[in-house]
Amino acid sequence: MRGKSAVLLSLIMLIAGFLISFSFQMTKENNKSAAETEEWKKEYALRDELLKQEKENKKFEKELYQKQNKVRQAENKLKKEKSEYYNVLEDTEKYRMYIGEVGVQGEGVEVTLEDASYIPEGENVNSYIVHESHIFQVVNELYISGAAAVAVNGQRLTHDSYIKCNGPVVTVDGVQHPAPFTVSAIGDPDVLLPSLNIAGGLIDQLSMDHISVSAEKEKNVQMKPILKTKE
């Protein structure tokens, strides 16, 4: 009887131990599963947050690109307006210089015309002196060659200036100038001077008219505004 009781007790203890072990294992597994589930939830929430952040960033990037594009368009428009403004200023300054409202200076050339130093006996004196036509020829040649401003004996010329010979003097816009006559021009001397000295050109023609003529480069030709010149 005792043997049966011992066997029964052992069996009960074995079953109890198994149940306890099984319960512990299940509890451990459940805890592990719960922890994994919680970790997965955290990872999912984090991943979802990252996706939302990326979506938000893309939205901001798009807005930034649109604003940058607007800024570039505004800059280009401003550059164009600025360029047009400077072009207008430049054209206005050129026009003011052309009509003689402003004083100008720069490199250029000076052409000096003088009456012939020797007049053969019996020859007509008028054939050996400087006339307005000679001065006109020089002035026109300089303008054609790109002169920005021209003066005769320091007096600025305008688009409607007149030059008239009156005996030994030449009248420019009502102001008389005695010989020699110096025609000054502001412009590229490497263009102006060759245009005068070309073979068979103006200087050769003037020499054939018995006019003493010389042309030289000048580093700094200065001209006053026309209104001040006429004062």
Swiss-Prot record:
Alphabetized Pfam families for the sequence: DUF881 (PF05949)
Position of the signal peptide: 1-34
Entry annotated with the keyword DNA repair: no
Top-rank taxon: Bacteria
Gene Ontology terms: biological process: cell division; sporulation resulting in formation of a cellular spore
Induction (free text): By vancomycin.
Positions in coiled-coil regions: 44-94
Keywords for this protein: Cell cycle, Cell division, Coiled coil, Signal, Sporulation
Residues passing through the membrane, by range: none
Keyword Signal part of the UniProt annotation: yes
Function: May be involved in cell division and sporulation.
Family designation: Belongs to the UPF0749 family.
Protein name: UPF0749 protein YlxW
Organism of origin: Bacillus subtilis (strain 168)
Taxonomic placement: Bacteria, Bacillati, Bacillota, Bacilli, Bacillales
